[in-house]
Amino acid sequence: MLEEVLIKVLVLNDLYSTNILGTYAVAKHILDLHIDERLKNGDASLVTDIAHIELNGKEKYFYSFATKYCAMHQPKLFPIYDRFVGEMLRYFRKQTHFARFANADLKNYAEYRTIYDAFIQFFALNDFTYKQVDNYLWKLGKEHVQEKGKKEK
């Protein structure tokens, strides 16, 4: 069982460049949480529980990785968070006022999922999956961040 979790952690770490150095410790941490029921139920607090880990005596918070791990298992229940998606949700909040939220709310997974769902509702994207919306926001966010970087130079 640990080997299966470790493979998933390694794949996600490579695929999404999550920069987790202690992959074995993260896999063991996930296994120790006994997550199956919580994944099945879409338990938002699971993201926080996976994200919080102590590595080499230091407290780490792998939030983006934790959202991706949960989304890999239950893509209909867990939208992915990363900096590009967060950037675009903040951008659309400013441009359209689709939802009221503090930036810090994006790092509270229950709040984040509510914000994400509000974005989907506001823009009538109900026919699209979380994964499809994530792909759109990620690509747009990456371009947006690159453009901002060019303007700052």
PLM segments and residue spans:
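An N-terminal alpha-helical hairpin/helix-loop-helix interaction module that forms a charged
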Residues: 1-58, 75-153
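Short hydrophobic alpha-helical segments that form membrane-spanning helices or hydrophobic packing faces
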Residues: 65-71
